[in-house]
């Protein structure tokens, strides 16, 4: 089998969730971190497809869990973006780099806060030392994202409370100098404004 055919077979095995085929390709000498045209490794493909047993197998076999594809996805960031708590719990013990950025310059907790992924946010805050005050490319912290980009509903209120309880700075402004409290009030998110006030905003 040619090297190219072996790579194709390996990445297809990840796509299909076929551990035996992954194992066979590795035994034939395929590079575990080889990528397709989108710069996706087998572990990124398996993560996107929710083939959890394959992800576990590839971690145990030494796959690079931090390598990112051309849209900045890696297993850790995929779990945060897609609300995949199972994947997150598989990846965290492998000690992923929590400072890897999404294509918008956020860390994992940034999109999770924005999208209302309560359990992901809770897991990150309770199990990791991820930077709760990281500022992304547009100048927003996870707290600002949780307020500005969503509907202010129950999930967002819970996320705001979790962030504040774990050290989110209620005084960090956006790039226009607006505080979380000002933004919450502008949007009519009174419950979030109350949480911010209780946290000393």
Predicted region positions:
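Conserved ankyrin/ankyrin-like repeat signature
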Residues: 21, 53-54, 86-87, 119-120, ...
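Ankyrin repeat domain, specifically the short helix-to-loop turn at the C-terminus of the second helix
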Residues: 23-31, 56-64, 89-97, 122-131, ...
């Amino acid at each position: 089998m040619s090297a190219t055919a072996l790579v194709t077979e390996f990445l297809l095995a990840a796509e299909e969730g076929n551990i035996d085929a992954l194992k066979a390709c590795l035994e034939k000498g395929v590079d575990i971190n080889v990528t397709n045209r989108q710069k996706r490794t087998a572990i990124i493909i398996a993560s996107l497809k929710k083939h959890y047993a394959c992800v576990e197998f590839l971690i145990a076999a030494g796959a690079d869990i931090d390598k990112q594809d051309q849209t900045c996805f890696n297993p850790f960031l995929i779990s945060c973006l897609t609300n995949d708590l199972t994947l997150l719990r598989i990846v965290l013990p492998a000690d992923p780099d929590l400072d890897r950025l999404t294509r918008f310059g956020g860390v994992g907790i940034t999109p999770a806060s924005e999208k209302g992924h309560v359990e992901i946010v809770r897991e990150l805050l309770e199990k990791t030392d991820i930077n709760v005050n990281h500022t992304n490319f547009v100048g927003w912290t996870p707290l600002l994202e949780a307020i500005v980009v969503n509907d202010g509903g129950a999930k967002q209120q819970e996320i705001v409370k979790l962030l504040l309880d774990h050290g989110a700075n209620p005084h960090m402004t956006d790039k226009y100098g607006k505080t979380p409290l000002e933004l919450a009030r502008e949007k009519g998110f009174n419950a979030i404004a109350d949480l911010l006030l209780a946290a000393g905003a």
